[in-house]
Amino acid sequence: MNPPLVLVPLALEWVVIASIIAPLWYGFFTKRPRLGIASWFLLFLSSGIALVAALFVAVWSVAYNFENLEKHSESLVLTIVYSLAPWILLAMAGVALNLINLRVELVVQNFKQLMAVPVLPGKHLRTFQGVTVEVVEIESVFAIALNRPKKILISRGALTELSVAEFEAVLWHEYGHLAARHNALKRLAKMVALLAGFIRASKVMSHEIERLCEVAADNYAMKRVDPLVLKSARAKFQ
């Protein structure tokens, strides 16, 4: 069976298209964050599969043509051409990706948001929807949901700034992260960005997944509290 060389340019074309699509999608799924999260992961999963398929066919082609060379030595030139063709395509795709990366890097710089995750000891404050809420004795204003163990941390500074209604809204927002397992999704997105660091668009995906998780948690909270109260609470965390 001959290696399907036509898959190499098709697969590489999809990898390039995915790299182009990524920055264009930024902010596109704000009204449908769940769909956005699924779409981002599907985009990079499909491009990853395409890249692996292209490499597999390229290696298969080399092995096949060397075997063919042993049987039909008179077709030496043709065999060499067929052996080199997939690798030339891979090299061309690499150049194209590097050019795209230069453009996407500008998007990363504009939209990159650093997220500091404090790992601090807290004191039990209350239980919310079966989840322990702990207060951390620092004056900075922050709140964060943790999965292991499952709990919500909130700073003393935040408790001082928030009204009772705003505190309730913050708890629903953080509980929304836990209910949808957003921490796991964000870790997966960061892992993809790390493994596919040569594709700058993966970093755009990581930041967009993080933003969409925040939007989804807001939507979850707004079904249970006054949206204006949630907006007021969020303003105190900026």
Predicted regions and their residues:
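Hydrophobic transmembrane alpha-helical segments in integral membrane proteins
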Residues: M1-I17
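Alpha-helical transmembrane segments and adjacent TM-loop junctions that form the membrane-embedded core
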Residues: L76-A85, A165, R181-A184, L188-K190
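Hydrophobic, aromatic-rich membrane-embedded alpha-helical segments
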Residues: A189-A201
